[in-house]
Amino acid sequence: IAYILKAFADSLFGNLMTVDTAAWFESFSMTSYSVIPYHIIVVVGTLLTLFLGARSIEKTNKIMMPLFFIIFLILAARVAMMPGAWEGYKFIFTPKWEELIDPMTWIWAMGQAFFSLSVTGSGMIVYGAYLSKDENVISVSQHTAFFDTIAAVVAAIVIIPACFAYGTDVGAGPSLLFVTLPAILQDVPMGQLFAVILYAAMIFAGVSSLQNMFEAV
């Protein structure tokens, strides 16, 4: 989240829209202690939301998350028009059936599912404690899994085709968020505004996850 806060700040002031994103990310991530101020801000900010009440984060997320989806759909349309994007779609949607017989495929998939849904963490326990007794747990769980999967697919159809269009390694990890995504935003109208909203939405989503970790402690 500290890295995302850095990206948000540079988007807000326009710096991220005018730099070589790969050089920007490398300079920041490889500089000793550069992330500490942002990390402190994130930790203190999260603690304040817990002390002062987390309802504001919940209300904000109800606005930011739909905006997040809308902007990603706009970016998906832009990426679809880039040369080489089709190779990205083939990479995503061409099944490799032989991989299903590899036990590690299932282990990685289950690990990703557990992490993404906070099944093995404190998230379900903490937020479940606040759940109304009138809620249908099975129905809510189904909705959570469904929308989590939709979010992953939407992100994939933006990032992966863009990797092929820009010649970026699809297995690059965090740099996809801080190199590939900003590069796309530099190429679209109102890219700076979209960048500010996207990274702000990611911060709110991240803080909502940190809240349950801190509260469990």
Predicted features, each with a name:
Residues 1-55, 84-107, 174-178:
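Inter-helical loop and helix-membrane interface segments of multi-pass membrane transporters/permeases
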Residues 58, 62-211:
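Membrane-embedded translocation segments of transport machinery
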